[in-house]
Amino acid sequence: MVFADLGRRLNSALGDFSKATSVNEELVDTLLKNICTALLETDVNVRLVQELRSNIKKKINVSTLPQGINGKRIVQKAVFDELCSLVDPKVDAFTPKKGRPSVIMMVGLQGSGKTTTCSKLALHYQRRGLKSCLVAADTFRAGAFDQLKQNAIKARVPYFGSYTETDPVVIAKEGVDKFKNDRFDVIIVDTSGRHQQEQELFAEMVEISDAIRPDQTIMILDASIGQAAESQSKAFKETADFGAVIITKLDGHAKGGGALSAVAATKTPIVFIGTGEHINDLERFSPRSFISKLLGLGDLEGLMEHVQSLDFDKKNMVKNLEQGKFTVRDFRDQLGNIMKLGPLSKMASMIPGMSNMMNGMNDEEGSLRMKRMLYIVDSMTEQELDSDGLLFVEQPSRVLRVARGSGTSVLEVEETISQVRVFAQMAKKIGGKDGILGKLGGNPAAALKKDPRQLAAMQKRMQAMGMGGGMPGLNPGSMNFGDISKMANMLMGGGGPGGAGGMDFSGMLNQFQNMQKPPRRR
């Protein structure tokens, strides 16, 4: 991944700083030297690195810093804030709204990934309830319309283009007018890739802009082009005056610092980042979340948004859990949900501390193992799917049949059944009349408020089930009754039986953040 090496080096510099017994001028200078060297070797502009160093030094007065961990935290916070400022021009980007047509024009260099990103962006807005569409106004590159057409069909997004018309201004105007009449919310116009030396194409870009009058112009910036990104971005800014940037190809191995320099030089916000070639590989950009992931501190907000965008079907499982049941079918549904989340390394980078633990782990191996588990459960009968796995314990011949039918080993089938059995036992302790939820009357928040003594009993049961280890960053001592009550309500989606529509992820996130200590760097 782009910036992976930068993240490791920044982590290492902050880790060495944290190990020191006391904070002094020499220690701070060493930290800043290591950080600046890492940024320079990633192609970040020298002027920006000098500004970052100067700003950190202004914020830190070593002579007045408290000794020990508090002094270190002040220095670490200053570093974190300045790294955020590096990628945050503090300019609000345009946001499309439902019921009002918004025209977005995409510009950028040839080969930067504009056409693919157009489809990703249309799908992103469509999933959030906005009617999205695409206009293919790239008549310069052979096959551009065909590529956009294929991507649009895959994303199930309406599109407009022409095989006969060669004037991109005419195509763009006709497409935008058509979709405005059809009351679309987001109209994304794909234009030809162009270089700053190609004055004719730059003039064409201005003509298209004058014809369609976009609400927002977005520049697609390839993370791999290095220090040339700054000069190219300035040329586009002067001509098209783009209001936002999408950085693509962040799944590669280029340095990527040039793209960050371009953002700082043009004072334009990054709105999204492309993390892969697939249609779902587009992430909303948040400066603090980006730097947090870079330093190995995770991005819970991004994780929750990603989970919510996938629209998991949880109704059947929630209903079964309330009754104290967990079936093989529930297990299969959850496997499918996990695979929708994407590569394990991507998820790990969003969870504090997990990115370091994932070093050396192979995404392909993890994905293959989950696929083989799906093969196993897909080879079962309806009766077996609706069981809690006990059927296989009572009739071992079923294990051999499923192994043969799925092309897996008997051991793999037994391991899968064992996992289902573990979840089934947990479900019994959680649901039903005699379970945790049953004793809380189906509404955890209300029951705990009525009788706080049940909180202690619930904690003991969860510890006995191996669920009392806590979450990284949570301070159990700081959790009060109000925190537990709110979280319990969120876990049930805001209600008891009949009203449980799934977890309130954003609410849970806010509650976790309120209870978190400042993260420790080791």
Curated annotation (Swiss-Prot):
Region G-domain, annotated ranges: 1-295
Keywords: Cytoplasm, Endoplasmic reticulum, GTP-binding, Hydrolase, Nucleotide-binding, Ribonucleoprotein, RNA-binding, Signal recognition particle
Subunit structure: Fungal signal recognition particle consists of a 7S RNA molecule (scR1) and at least six protein subunits: srp72, srp68, srp54, sec65, srp21 and srp14. Interacts with srp101.
Membership in a protein family: Belongs to the GTP-binding SRP family. SRP54 subfamily.
Domain notes: The NG domain, also named G domain, is a special guanosine triphosphatase (GTPase) domain, which binds GTP and forms a guanosine 5'-triphosphate (GTP)-dependent complex with a homologous NG domain in the SRP receptor subunit srp101. The two NG domains undergo cooperative rearrangements upon their assembly, which culminate in the reciprocal activation of the GTPase activity of one another. SRP receptor compaction upon binding with cargo-loaded SRP and GTPase rearrangement drive SRP-mediated cotranslational protein translocation into the ER.
Top-level class of the enzyme under EC nomenclature: hydrolase
CC per GO annotation: cytosol; endoplasmic reticulum; signal recognition particle, endoplasmic reticulum targeting
GO biological process: SRP-dependent cotranslational protein targeting to membrane; SRP-dependent cotranslational protein targeting to membrane, translocation
Nuclease among keywords: no
Protein name: Signal recognition particle subunit SRP54
HAMAP family attached to this UniProt entry: SRP54
